[in-house]
């Protein structure tokens, strides 16, 4: 995607506002709005999906440029099978077409690619391509691209619970062994850090069964911009917004025990 001088200048200005010490290492994105984008333009929904692929390539590059380590994108959910069959077929064919075309460049860019989800319903040709692509890029360390295909957060949690139950009933583990670390090890995302930032395009304020366990403490950024219109500038705005927040993980902001007690005493005194 060619950028004009104004866009390049805008991207540079936004990049200069970033705190290089507070770049999120793992960013997750719900890429929403392809169909609506196409419909608004009087085009078939397939045009939106094709444009969405171009945008993803731009955002992968932007993620690497700011030294983000992991990008996880929601490409196809377990619920997406209920869409019209012609759209589902188009999307599955698009995955295969794009992966065939881009895998060499992905490898050359030292990107490790991983597909997350239940891949069993996919065509054999796509499953073989996914397997070979993951094997080819497995030793790449600079950047990881996780693509969630036929993925559902609830299904992932249920699967992990079943695996733990089987191991417990067979005596491989004791109930007392079960903790967050063990549960994490049974998830499809095992070995990957949790996202610090979730970006959702299209203005929808929900997480749509995406990474339900992993997003427990993620900052969430929602933009009204539809995914095909999502640019590097919009991406950088999300990072800047993230950096303006104070991640407390359930705690409180810079408040010592003494000041908390003083605050409580002061409130009680006012009520006397």
Curated annotation (Swiss-Prot):
Mg(2+) binds at residues 32, 219. Keywords: Magnesium, Metal-binding, Transferase. It comes from the Bacteria. The active site is at 32, 80 (proton acceptor). The keyword Cytoplasm does not apply. Its EC number is 2.5.1.-. Binds 2 magnesium ions per subunit. The keyword Transferase applies. InterPro entries: UPP_synth-like (IPR001441), UPP_synth-like_CS (IPR018520), UPP_synth-like_sf (IPR036424). One of its GO terms (biological process) is polyprenol biosynthetic process. Substrate binds at residues 33-37, 45, 49, 77-79, 81, 83, 200, 206-208. GO terms for molecular function: ditrans,polycis-polyprenyl diphosphate synthase [(2E,6E)-farnesyl diphosphate specific] activity; magnesium ion binding. Transmembrane segments: none annotated. Gene3D superfamilies: Decaprenyl diphosphate synthase-like. It is an enzyme of class 2 (transferase). It holds the Pfam family Prenyltransf. Its cofactor is Mg(2+). Belongs to the UPP synthase family. Catalyzes the condensation of isopentenyl diphosphate (IPP) with allylic pyrophosphates generating different type of terpenoids. Homodimer. This is Isoprenyl transferase. It comes from Prochlorococcus marinus subsp. pastoris (strain CCMP1986 / NIES-2087 / MED4). The gene is uppS.
């Amino acid at each position: 995607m060619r950028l004009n001088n104004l866009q390049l200048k805008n991207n540079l200005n936004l990049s200069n506002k970033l705190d290089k010490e507070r770049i999120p290492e793992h960013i997750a994105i719900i890429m929403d709005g392809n169909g609506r984008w196409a419909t608004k333009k009087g085009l078939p929904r397939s045009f939106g999906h094709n444009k969405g692929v171009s945008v993803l390539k731009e955002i992968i590059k932007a993620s690497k440029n700011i030294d983000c380590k992991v990008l996880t994108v929601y490409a196809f959910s377990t619920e997406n099978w209920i869409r019209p069959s012609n759209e589902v077929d188009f999307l599955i064919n698009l995955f295969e077409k794009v992966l065939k075309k881009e895998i060499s460049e992905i490898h050359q860019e030292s990107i490790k690619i991983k597909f997350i989800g239940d891949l069993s319903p996919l065509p054999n040709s796509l499953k073989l391509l996914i397997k070979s692509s993951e094997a080819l890029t497995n030793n790449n360390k600079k950047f990881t691209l996780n693509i969630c295909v036929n993925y559902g957060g609830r299904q992932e949690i249920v699967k992990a619970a079943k695996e733990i139950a089987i191991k417990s009933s067979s005596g491989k583990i004791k109930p007392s062994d079960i903790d967050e670390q063990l549960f994490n090890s049974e998830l499809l995302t095992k070995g990957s850090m949790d996202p610090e930032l979730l970006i959702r395009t299209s203005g929808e304020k929900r997480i749509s069964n995406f990474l339900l366990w992993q997003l427990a403490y993620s900052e969430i950024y929602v933009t009204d911009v539809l995914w095909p219109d999502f640019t590097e500038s919009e991406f950088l705005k999300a990072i800047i917004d993230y950096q303006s927040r104070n991640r407390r993980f359930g705690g409180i902001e810079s408040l010592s025990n003494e000041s908390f007690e003083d605050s409580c005493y002061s409130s009680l005194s006012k009520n006397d």
